[in-house]
């Protein structure tokens, strides 16, 4: 398999054959869903309800790490927390076909939430408190831990090694990110005082779907060990005052099930900085996958890097500036 273009052999026929091998009688309907890191399809079945198949990116996760993701989701579901868990075939959630590893999920629809009301924010907060309470019961063994080295320094090096930006900007980017990551690392010393646990890892509004019954959480692909604030800060938006108000609502629900350490609020801007650096590195690392140049053509343009540099300058000011306090 070509890991630079890992999905070139994943044809609709292979997808359907894989689903049949996992015990599903398909009716021939295959709809590609919006996903870049993995490939995700909605597949019609003769049983009635469509299912969703996720084909994991080759080379990214070990089998043990994927099974640990599945076990975490099953553990949450056993506590009646609304997460979408993979279907089992002969007791197994992870399958393989033609060199691809995949899992099959029930289709669970919904809309992306606005989180524009106190009720919605408290509702999500309650579930996050319950998720983290379960997450602290044990540790991951085969999945990563959130770190400045992984999300920051290794990501920065990937960008610089790829010669993505003009020479005049590359030196400035290297200097700026060195200062920024030094500052993030200094502030991240407080992570040692944070109680780490199993968390969702990529908890933004796009990974929450809402129905008349409330929210449910999808895609635990990035679950890892980390501080609780990582699953909260991406749900905040707007000015400091607006984010403070939103966080008050989230924590009102959260703390019905688990006490939140206010000291973790100092990690919000450092975590945002890491996400900004890591996002560009993610695109750089995936550029040989043909889906990425098609979806993100602006990434290879100097203008993107100029804007990214300015955003990192502003983020350095945010990291060293006043912290969000309740």
Region roles according to the model:
Residues 114-172, 194-196, 295-298:
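A cross-family kinase active-site recognition segment
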Residues 45-141:
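ATP-binding pocket architecture of kinase catalytic cores
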Residues 1-88, 212-214, 324-326:
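Conserved NTP-binding catalytic cores of kinases and kinase-like/nucleotidyltransferase enzymes
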Residues 262-272:
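All-alpha amphipathic helical-bundle segments outside canonical DNA-binding/catalytic cores
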Residues 3, 163-164, 281-326:
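ATP/Mg2+ or Mg2+-diphosphate-binding catalytic cores
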Residues 228-259, 275-291:
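Active-site activation/catalytic loop segments of kinase-like enzymes and analogous catalytic loops
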């Amino acid at each position: 398999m070509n890991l630079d273009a890992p999905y070139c052999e994943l044809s609709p026929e292979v997808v359907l054959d894989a689903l049949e091998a996992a015990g599903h009688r398909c009716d021939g309907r295959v709809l590609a869903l919006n996903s870049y890191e993995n490939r995700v399809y909605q597949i019609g079945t003769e049983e009635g309800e469509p299912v969703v198949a996720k084909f994991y990116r080759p080379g990214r996760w070990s089998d043990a790490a994927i099974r640990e993701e599945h076990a975490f989701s099953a553990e949450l579901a056993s506590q009646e927390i609304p997460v979408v868990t993979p279907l089992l075939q002969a007791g197994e959630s992870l399958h393989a076909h033609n060199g691809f590893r995949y899992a099959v999920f029930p289709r669970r629809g919904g809309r992306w939430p606005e989180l524009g009301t106190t009720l919605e924010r408290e509702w999500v907060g309650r579930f996050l408190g319950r998720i983290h309470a379960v997450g602290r019961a044990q540790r991951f063994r085969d999945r990563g831990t959130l770190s400045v080295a992984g999300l920051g320094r290794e990501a920065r090096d990937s960008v610089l090694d790829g010669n993505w930006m003009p020479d005049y900007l590359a030196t400035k980017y290297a200097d700026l990110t060195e200062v920024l990551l030094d500052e993030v690392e200094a502030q991240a010393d407080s992570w040692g005082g944070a109680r780490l646990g199993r968390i969702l890892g990529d908890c933004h509004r796009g990974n929450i779907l809402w129905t008349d019954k409330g929210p449910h959480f999808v895609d635990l692909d990035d679950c890892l060990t980390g501080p609780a604030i990582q699953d909260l800060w991406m749900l905040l938006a707007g000015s400091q005052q607006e984010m403070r108000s939103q966080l008050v609502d989230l924590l009102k629900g959260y703390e019905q099930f688990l006490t939140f350490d206010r000291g973790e609020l100092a990690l919000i801007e450092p975590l945002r900085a890491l996400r900004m650096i890591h996002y560009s590195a993610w695109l750089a690392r995936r550029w040989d996958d043909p889906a990425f140049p098609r979806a993100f053509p602006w990434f290879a343009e100097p203008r993107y890097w100029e804007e990214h540099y300015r955003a990192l300058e502003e983020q350095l000011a945010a990291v060293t500036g006043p912290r969000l306090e309740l």
